[in-house]
């Protein structure tokens, strides 16, 4: 049991991805007026809650992880940290994260963190991941909470921009997750996890991927059409979304589904990273918003 093991079970890669989206939502709402204390609270608080969820997920998934090539060497599977210690660790992380959001940002930010946590740990990890083909859809809501937390930490209200972020990031999760399930197909099959590609076949999953990316593309453009983001954001969102859609379409002619799915997965990360960056720098200032609505 070492510091390295405690870091590993929080899934740092997932935390990093979520932190980027928190920043995107935060700067979109800040419109150039940054409160450093709230920014740090949103970033650190969300990171702690996400880390807590990941540790709880590791605790819950020990039996599944043992059956999957990708996860069979995880810390808890190998017994490098005891279950009891991991549960206490996860609880401390979660409480600390929610408290930081509640007291330094605002209760609304803390509420969305709790909602995301409950969906991920309670609904997805404990039950739906193992029992339902719709587990990915429900789980996608938890993955969409970080940008919303970042946004409401500043705005202290759930407005159209926050709703758009929720829809955008939920829709993004679906093709992203299905791509993983395709190139890790044998792992999911071995662990009897009823993800769409395993349960209904890869061809059906390809159709769903195409439709979700199309819906995602439309949702991303709404930030500009609703007056929250600028034209540079729109250009990047349209270009990235359309190319991702094209990549999905090529899946119907793919010679190797594993190679295709891995490329789709990698580009999904580039896409959501680019959009998080663009909404951070190409927001509409309050005066610009007034002009937008005046017209």
Swiss-Prot record:
- From what organism does this protein derive? Pseudomonas fluorescens (strain ATCC BAA-477 / NRRL B-23932 / Pf-5)
Q: Localized where?
A: Cell inner membrane
Remarks, miscellaneous = Carbon 2 of the heme B porphyrin ring is defined according to the Fischer nomenclature.
| Reaction catalysis annotation | heme b + (2E,6E)-farnesyl diphosphate + H2O = Fe(II)-heme o + diphosphate
**Function summary:** Converts heme B (protoheme IX) to heme O by substitution of the vinyl group on carbon 2 of heme B porphyrin ring with a hydroxyethyl farnesyl side group.
| A Pfam family of this chain | UbiA
Source domain of life: Bacteria
Entry annotated with the keyword Iron: no
- The name this protein carries in UniProt is Protoheme IX farnesyltransferase 2
Q: Which GO terms describe its cellular component?
A: plasma membrane
* Keywords recorded for this protein, A-Z: Cell inner membrane, Cell membrane, Heme biosynthesis, Membrane, Transferase, Transmembrane, Transmembrane helix
Q: What is its EC number?
A: 2.5.1.141
Biological process annotations from GO: heme O biosynthetic process
Membrane topology, as annotated, equals: Multi-pass membrane protein
Query: What top-level class of enzyme does the UniProt entry assign?
Result: transferase
Q: Does the keyword Isomerase apply?
A: no
> Which pathway does this polypeptide act in?
Porphyrin-containing compound metabolism; heme O biosynthesis; heme O from protoheme: step 1/1
Q: Which family does it belong to?
A: Belongs to the UbiA prenyltransferase family. Protoheme IX farnesyltransferase subfamily.
Which GO molecular function entries does the Swiss-Prot or TrEMBL record give? Answer: protoheme IX farnesyltransferase activity
Transmembrane spans: 9-29, 36-56, 85-105, 108-128, 135-155, 163-183, 209-229, 230-250, 263-283
């Amino acid at each position: 049991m070492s510091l390295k093991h405690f870091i590993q079970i929080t899934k740092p890669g997932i935390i990093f991805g979520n932190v980027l989206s928190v920043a995107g939502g935060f700067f979109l709402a800040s419109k150039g007026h940054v409160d450093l204390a709230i920014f740090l609270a949103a970033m650190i608080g969300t990171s702690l809650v996400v880390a807590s969820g990941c540790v709880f997920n590791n605790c819950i998934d020990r039996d599944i992880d043992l059956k999957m090539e990708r996860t069979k060497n995880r810390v808890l599977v190998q017994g490098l940290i005891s279950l009891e210690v991991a549960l206490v660790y996860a609880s401390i992380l979660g409480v600390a994260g929610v408290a930081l959001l509640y007291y330094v940002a605002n209760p609304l930010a803390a509420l969305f963190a709790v909602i995301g946590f409950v969906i991920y740990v309670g609904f997805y990890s404990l039950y739906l991941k193992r029992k339902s083909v719709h587990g990915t859809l429900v789980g996608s809501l938890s993955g969409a909470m970080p940008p919303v937390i970042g946004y409401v930490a500043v705005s202290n209200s759930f407005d159209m921009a926050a709703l758009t972020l929720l829809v955008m990031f939920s829709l993004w999760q679906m093709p992203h997750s299905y791509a993983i399930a395709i190139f890790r197909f044998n792992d999911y099959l071995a662990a009897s996890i009823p993800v769409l590609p395993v349960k209904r076949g890869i061809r059906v999953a390809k159709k769903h991927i195409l439709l979700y990316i199309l819906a995602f593309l439309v949702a991303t453009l709404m930030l500009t059409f609703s007056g929250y983001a600028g034209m540079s954001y729109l250009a990047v969102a349209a270009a990235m979304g359309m190319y991702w859609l094209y990549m999905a379409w090529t899946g119907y002619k793919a010679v190797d589904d594993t190679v295709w799915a891995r490329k789709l997965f990698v580009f999904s990360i580039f896409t959501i990273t680019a959009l998080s960056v663009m909404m951070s720098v190409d927001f509409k200032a309050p005066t610009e918003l007034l002009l937008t609505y005046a017209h």
